[in-house]
From Swiss-Prot:
PANTHER family: OS03G0856100 PROTEIN, OS12G0638900 PROTEIN. GO terms for biological process: mRNA processing; mRNA stabilization. It comes from Zea mays (Maize). Belongs to the PPR family. P subfamily. This is Pentatricopeptide repeat-containing protein 10, chloroplastic. It comes from the Eukaryota. PPR repeats lie at residues 137-167, 173-207, 208-243, 244-278, 279-313, 314-348, 349-383, 384-418, 419-453, 454-488, 489-523, 524-558, 560-594, 595-629, 630-664, 666-700, 701-735, 736-770. Residues 1-71 are annotated as: Disordered. Forms homodimers. Its main location: plastid.
């Protein structure tokens, strides 16, 4: 399209007079930062590099049993000494060379002597040899199983159970069975543990309290087992076995894993009604239930009851309290838990520091978290792999890759070997739009290092691919996970909801939530938050209203900080002012601290609705809360002034940003001021701001020119409007259909219908994708009143 009129742009510094004099002064908008800013090769190099050989751990000295075991004959004592002094790698050959002598001896007595002298590895080797020779009975197996249990060798217990079956008609004692059950639970072999428990009862072995507690723990770790837990508790009481503090904490922890808050409270109250006095472990478990549910008020009530009943909080109590504050957004209160612990003579541990660092990370205060990390090291705590993983995750979210590399180097130098969680953290860091290949490369590196994929890894992969916008790969990982034998958990379903929330596919999201419930899972605050995001993205206002009713009406969903924050954001995306105000008031009424996202959302909605006084009140609240306004805050404030026809005030803020050392305006900032001047009919001022925008190195976008076109059209300056459109096309910026409509509507308001048709003809020649039928019909309707 050719420019018409008196040559609007050649006289302005923002536009070139012609291509022969100089190149275009207005370049295309700069591309988004390349994903290659993530130094993936360097990160993978750190992760795959062999860890420095750790200093050899001091082994427990293995000396001749002292005093000599009276139950052994002199020959047997000599044999035990020979076995225990022989190197493990060649022990099997040594045992074979003494076969006849060993078969004449009492294997169980030899095993007992080895176990009592601390030689459990030699005892295990002897038992395996005896098993192959058919010389191991149930008592021998019991002896070694209990020894392995005391040493925490759960994998060895499981392997021994698989390779050394009991002779027909024999059975272990209840202590040995309980040890095996515990080992199977720790190894994640829950179904095998339950099979063994059923076998134990078939054999007539009466479970002890410890046995029942271990099986309750199995159910808790399995998840979705509340009816079975209740049934087992009834069985315990019927057998005359009363629950103890460990039983209580185990059952409540099971409720915590599945988000069963009501069930946990009912069980706790029933315990008290039966005369049980809760101990600190039980109270701590209940604190964790409320903490993970985001209900910090109930957590504080539990703490008060605990102290009132003379049960002194311990370090775990304050760890849970700090975690509760962290999840509720109270980072300052979480940090104060460290001071409270010190005042009570309690030493914080690595978990305490990790929890407070998480609180800082949740509100984006990474520098404060790093300062606490340094403080932790100065006070003598050696960061473990969990601490490093936590810090790496925070740095990754903020794209502070240089510091990430330094942290990985420090981790390697300290002899802290990256584990599966470290790899999972790297997968999560790569989970950003446009970085799908990075996720795949990290996954390949993980597999090449022999790191086995766990359920957590698959959950991370589903979420990472979802953030990359790859629904196909996300669901592929879900299918691969189930094919590998992993059972989806609530984290898995939430990861799938995260994928769907980015597409607004609320219908599929609802089916996922239904499936969760069918499988026995209770949606948690994250589930509802993601479902709200699905509704918001898909424009399903009725869906948002349904969850609001569960939060404010029936009380089926607890109004945690996460839920209320998401309600503010979801209603904002759907432009539901009433819904936003209700959620915002609930945030304040419940004592939560609104974060900058909540404040900015409220400021923006008030600005868009021209509610000057309320917007100003929100801005003042931001400053009073100690938060620092960001660019979104100032853009919303400029939008408010622009909509109130105070564009000069909006420009003042723009100029302040231009002079700021810490924050610079973006294209939205300039567009907002330009739009304000255009709406006031001050097109020359708008064009002046455009000139300054280009001079400041900010490339205008299609919205910038669309706004200017609208400003000229509203003043019936059609030549100028068409010249702007021509300039856009010349510089590779495609006008929106709405841009063309603004011009046509202005022509029609001016009763210049033929010029409107001529404009459409010119557009159709230069924009081959433009379908002019709808606008032609609009002109006909405007001209003939149809």
């Amino acid at each position: 399209m050719e420019a018409t009129g008196r040559g609007l742009f050649p006289n302005k510094p923002t536009l070139p007079a012609g291509p022969r004099k100089r190149g275009p002064l207005l370049p295309a908008a700069p591309p988004p930062p390349s994903p290659s800013s993530l130094p993936l090769d360097s990160l993978l190099l750190h992760l795959t590099a062999p860890a420095p050989a750790p200093a050899p751990a001091p082994r427990r000295s293995h000396q001749t049993p002292t005093p000599p075991h009276s139950f052994l004959s002199p020959d047997a004592q000599v044999l035990v000494l020979a076995i225990s002094s022989h190197p493990l790698p060649t022990l099997a050959a040594f045992l074979a060379s003494r076969r006849d002598e060993l078969l004449r001896a009492d294997i169980t007595s030899l095993l007992k002597a080895l176990e009592l002298s601390g030689h459990w590895e030699w005892a295990l080797a002897l038992l395996r040899w005896a098993g192959k020779e058919g010389a191991a009975d149930a008592s021998a197996l019991e002896m070694v199983v209990r020894a392995l249990g005391r040493e925490g060798q759960h994998d060895a217990v499981c392997a021994l159970l698989d390779e050394t079956p009991l002779p027909p008609g024999s059975r272990l004692d209840v202590r040995a069975y309980t040890t095996v059950l515990h080992a199977l639970s720790r190894a994640g072999r829950y179904e095998r543990a339950l099979e063994l428990f059923a076998e134990l009862r078939r054999q007539g072995v009466a479970p002890t309290l410890v046995t029942y507690n271990v099986v309750l723990d199995v159910y808790g770790r399995m998840g979705r087992s509340w009816p079975r837990i209740v049934a087992l508790l009834d069985e315990m009481r019927a057998a005359g076995v009363e629950p103890d503090g460990f039983t209580a904490s185990t059952v409540i922890a099971a409720c915590c894993r599945d988000g069963l808050v009501d069930e946990a409270v009912a069980f706790f109250e029933d315990l008290k009604a039966r005369g049980h006095a809760p101990c600190v472990v039980t109270y701590n478990a209940l604190l964790q239930v409320f903490g993970k549910a985001g209900n910090y008020t109930e957590a504080l009530r539990v703490l008060g009851e605990m102290e009132q009943n003379g049960c002194q909080p311990d370090a775990v109590t304050y760890n849970e309290l700090a975690g509760t504050y962290a999840r509720a957004g109270f980072f300052e209160e979480a940090a104060r838990c460290l001071d409270t612990m010190a005042s009570k003579g309690l030493l914080p541990n690595a978990f305490t520091y990790n929890t407070v660092m998480t609180a800082y990370g949740n509100v984006g205060k990474v520098d404060e978290a790093l300062a606490l990390f340094d403080q932790m090291k100065k006070t003598g705590f050696v960061p473990n792999v969990n601490t490093y993983n936590l810090v790496l995750g925070m740095l990754g979210k903020k794209s502070r890759f240089t510091v990430m590399l330094e942290m990985l180097g420090e981790m390697s130098r300290s002899g802290c070997t990256p584990n599966r969680v470290t790899w999972n953290t790297m997968l999560a860091v790569c989970g950003k739009r446009g970085m799908e290949d990075y996720v795949t490369r990290v996954l390949e590196g993980m597999r090449s290092c022999g790191v086995e994929l766990s359920r957590d890894t698959y959950n991370t992969l589903i979420a990472a691919y979802g953030r990359c916008g790859s629904r196909t790969n996300a669901f592929k990982m879900y299918n691969e996970m189930t094919s590998a034998g992993f059972t989806p958990c609530i984290t898995t379903y939430n990861a799938l909801l995260n994928v769907l929330s980015r597409q607004g596919d609320w219908s599929t999201a609802q089916s996922i939530v239904s499936k969760m419930r069918t499988k026995g899972f209770k949606p948690n605050e994250q589930s509802y938050s993601l479902l709200l995001q699905c509704y918001a993205k898909g424009g399903n206002v009725a869906g948002i209203a349904a969850i609001e009713n569960e939060v404010y009406g029936s009380g089926a969903v607890f109004p945690s900080w996460v839920i209320l924050r998401t309600l503010v954001i979801a209603n904002f995306k759907c432009r539901r002012l009433d819904g936003m105000e209700t959620a915002f008031q609930e945030v304040k009424a419940r004592g939560y601290n609104p974060d900058l996202v909540i404040f900015n959302s409220m400021l923006s909605i008030y600005a868009k609705n021209g509610m000057y006084s309320k917007a100003t009140e929100v801005f003042d609240s931001i400053k009073r809360s100690g938060l620092s306004p960001d660019l979104i805050t100032y853009n919303s404030l400029m939008d408010m002034y622009a909509k109130c026809s105070e564009s000069w005030e909006a420009e003042k803020i723009l100029n302040q940003l231009k002079c700021s050392q810490t924050m610079k305006p973006d294209v939205v900032s300039y567009n907002t001021v330009i739009n304000g001047f255009c709406k006031q009919g001050l097109v020359k001022e708008a064009q002046r701001v455009l000139s300054e925008m280009v001079a400041d190195g900010m490339a205008p976008c299609a919205v910038t020119y669309h706004t200017l076109v609208g400003g000229y059209s509203s003043l019936e300056m059609f030549s100028e409007a068409r010249e702007v459109i021509g300039y856009m096309v010349q510089h590779g910026l495609k006008p929106m259909e709405l841009t063309y409509r603004r011009v046509v509507e202005s022509y029609c308001r001016a009763k210049r219908f033929e010029e409107a048709r001529g404009f459409l003809s010119e557009v159709s020649e230069t924009d081959l994708d433009f379908d002019k039928k709808a606008l032609e019909a609009y002109i006909e309707d405007a001209q003939f009143g149809r």
